[in-house]
A protein has these predicted regions:
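Non-catalytic DNA-recognition/assembly elements of restriction-modification systems
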Residues: 2-52, 172, 176, 180-225
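Active-site donor-nucleotide binding/catalytic segment of nucleotide-sugar enzymes
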Residues: 31, 60, 65, 161
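Short coil/turn segments at secondary-structure boundaries
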Residues: 37, 54-61, 155-157
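A short beta-sheet element
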Residues: 89-150, 156-161, 166-170
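Sequence-specific dsDNA recognition surfaces
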Residues: 42-55, 63, 68-98
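Glycine-anchored helix-breaking recognition loops at helix->coil/strand junctions
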Residues: 12, 67-68, 124-127, 142-204
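Short beta-strand-to-loop capping motifs
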Residues: 85, 131-132, 175-177
């Protein structure tokens, strides 16, 4: 998710809370969940991997997300950097990838899901990519990861200030696997909310761009607003 400007934070934060509540009701508080098989995260994913070691440059269209970009379950692209083009293969980000901060006390375990279509975008080696095996698992795995940040953080190795999240420990995490009908119904509920979040974000990015374009002209007097009746 692309981080929205403050203008719309409250709306999207409320939508995020709704999504989290729905996930909890369907998959945590639901007594039927005990009947679903317990499986490893590895069995439900096609990729669990750290990102790349980038070579930074301003003269590139390729974007590298870092740990600062992942906060409060949002992805803030404005804090990303550009790097020299390389063949990245499977580490190009895809819609639905779950991103997990993987180094450092206080940041390790933070998670967010890619709910936009990324273009020429990857992550650095301090972030783990978790890719669901299919579209039917996308929202389930993403929201499961976001709701299990503390459990993910507890998997760390190393001493204070040098903590790391081992990939194998992430892959070995266990979760319930709902039946396909339940997943389909859950996706039908979640998808419109996610779509609304993205629409709000895109609108706010557009408004922020207009604001940033107009403000210098207003400050310099290039645009005269003295005759506007309020």
């Amino acid at each position: 998710m692309i981080l929205p400007p403050k203008h719309n934070n409250k709306i999207n934060d409320n939508l995020q809370q709704q999504v989290a509540t729905i996930f909890h009701q369907w998959f945590v508080a639901n007594p039927e969940s005990e009947k679903w098989p317990l499986v490893t995260l590895d069995s439900l994913t096609s990729l669990v991997s750290r990102g790349i070691a980038p070579k930074y440059t301003d003269d590139s269209v390729q974007i590298v997300l870092n740990q600062k970009c992942i906060r409060d379950h949002y992805i803030d692209i404005s804090l990303a950097r550009r790097h020299n083009p390389k063949v990245i293969n499977e580490k190009w980000l895809q819609y639905g990838d779950l991103l997990i901060n993987s180094t450092g006390e206080g940041t390790l375990g933070r998670a967010a899901q890619v709910w936009f279509v990324p273009d020429n975008m990857t992550v650095d080696s301090h972030v783990t990519i978790v890719r669901p095996k299919g579209p039917h698992l996308l929202f389930y795995i993403g929201l499961w990861g976001i709701s299990h940040e503390r459990e993910i953080e507890a998997l760390h190795t190393g001493s204070t200030g040098q903590t790391e999240l081992p990939r194998e420990r992430v892959k070995a995490m266990e979760l319930r696997l709902p039946d396909n009908d339940t997943l389909a119904r859950f996706n039908a509920v979640i998808a419109p909310i996610v779509s609304l979040i993205i629409t709000n974000q895109q609108e706010n990015v557009r408004l922020a761009s207009v604001r940033d374009s107009l403000l210098p002209k207003l400050m310099s007097g290039e645009i005269d607003v003295s005759d506007i009746q309020l």
